[in-house]
Amino acid sequence: MASIEDVRRITADFPRVTERTGGHNGGSSWRTNAGMLAWERPPRRSDLEQLAALGREWPDGVILGIRVDGEVAKAAVLETYPDVFFTIPHFDGFPAVLTRLDVIDVQLLREMLTDAWLLRAPKTVAAAWLKEHGLA
């Protein structure tokens, strides 16, 4: 089980990430200059209506959007962890998954956020960070 505080703690380790609060949903988002890597994502009325039409419901708890490396990666994450990650029609064709923080393991959250950050970080910054952490 993870929390927004875990997201803050994990992303604080990544260079050039800032947290912003606000936007159209009023929640927090974590970004680099290249864009968001993660964001709080409450349901919109249209999400609830579309899910209801599909016979599905929005899960309880805090939901976090996390960027992934394209549609193939998205499909793999959704298939591998169906109780943790989900998607909605609004995200069709968009490289991100929705994450149930109340069920995700903190280590898996760290891996997903690291991968998302690597997609958004400058290549030289990412390479230096990977080397510093023994991952390169």
Where are the regions that the model predicts?
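Charge-dense, helix-prone N-terminal extensions
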Residues: M1-A136
